Amino acid sequence: FFGSVRFVYETGIKNRLMETGLTYTSTVVVSKENVAATMGSGDLNVFATPAMVALMENAAMNAVAGGLPEGSTTVGAMMNTTHIKPSAVGDTVSATAVLKEVEGRKLTFEVRAQDSKGVIGEGTHVRYIVDKEKFMSKLS
């Protein structure tokens, strides 16, 4: 996708380096557990859209996990995808996320999923860097 561009963001503790171009691919085999009929998103035994979105989020999370400050994580905030084609039970689906933009704590990714026949979905995903303790304290 794009060449690497370096950004530094302020964590409140110390500066960390986050580079565009960071990439990760997550893979899953289509099974009874992740088809639309089981997940409740449809009534066919094909790879479910929610499963594709989760795989894309997993790839984005892992793309930047190694560069986060201690005590931080990322949380998904926006997903804009199209699910172009179905994937059959037994096929392998891979989702790749590429970090495209860093704006402070906001991370924007290009995401794409494919199976053995080609691209099955693509889109844009936004995650935010958060402090785990502060984030979880919002539950109470």
Q: Where are the language model's segments positioned?
A:
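Catalytic strand-loop segment that frames the active site of acyl-thioester-processing enzymes
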Residues: 15-47
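Short, small-residue-biased leader/transition segments that mark boundaries at the very start
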Residues: 1-9
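Short, residue-level hotspots on alpha-helical faces of the histone-fold
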Residues: 54-58, 62
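A structural signal for short, well-ordered beta-strand segments
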Residues: 24-28, 79-83, 97, 111, ...
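Hydrophobic beta-sheet segments that form the core/acyl-binding groove
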Residues: 81-116
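Residues at secondary-structure transition points
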Residues: 43, 47-51, 78, 108, ...
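C-terminal binding/interaction regions
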Residues: 19-25, 34, 102-109, 116-136
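Hydrophobic beta-strand-centered segment that forms part of the acyl-chain substrate-binding groove
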Residues: 61-93
